Amino acid sequence: MKLLENHNVILTGASRGIGRGIALKLAEQGANVAFTYLSSEAKAKELEAELQAKGVKAKAYHSDAADYKAAEQLITDVQADFGKIDSLINNAGITKDGLLMRMSEEQFDDVIKANLKSVFNTTKAVQRAMLKERKGSIINITSVVGIRGNAGQANYAASKAGIIGFTKSVALELGSRSIRCNAVAPGFIETEMTAVLDEKVVAGWREGIPLKRGGTPEDVANAVVFLASDWSSYITGQVLQVDGGMLT
């Protein structure tokens, strides 16, 4: 039997990269997937069809998780379309890198809103449904940058570190209702975004990782599936690093 048979999942930011990889792996394990996108409707519809071809229910929602009212509406719409919600995976996020000296207030605020406030919005909106069921798994995608920081990414690091603190607090608040909350912290993950980088630079990054390779979206997705499933039923408030040993 598949790990997530008849499991209904909401996944934010799924049309490309890590989010897309998570969506595909969820469907492979039997989950019905409600996912959000902001930019390309064509890519979203393409993913929707791929997921449905795996024999699960899937639907794309054009929704901005950083907008509180939109997040509330998303949960309402997914409940109407799918019924109960078993897992929420907060993956949506952006980067607007720059050294602190040159970083604008807008750059900082935009990243905090898209990466951190979005997690608050969707988690707050979904908790009522999960409290009613007295069960649920919330999984927040953070980053190794949120653990150790990174020059030129003060805004991004702050948002991802905030997600870790938020995750642990939610785990403490909702644990008595059998609602778990964990985070996944990817390291260097090779996606279409990294494919355009100089190969020598990428090779240097790989060499600095104990496993001597970059990760894949599937590596992250495997961790997410584990945390969404009953195999992790006694795990909450944790940060699972998927980084090839980068921070070891």
Predicted regions located by residue number:
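Substrate-binding pocket helix/loop in short-chain dehydrogenase/reductase
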Residues: 99-100, 104-112, 194, 205
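Active-site helix of classical SDR
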Residues: 123, 159, 167
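C-terminal helical subdomain
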Residues: 183, 206-231, 235, 244
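Residue(s) in the substrate-gating loop at a strand-loop-helix junction
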Residues: 143
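Alpha-helical segment proximal to the catalytic Tyr-Lys
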Residues: 128, 172-176, 233
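Conserved glycine-rich cofactor-binding loop
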Residues: 8, 15-17
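Conserved glycine-rich Rossmann-like NAD(P)H-binding loop of the short-chain dehydrogenase/reductase
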Residues: 31-46
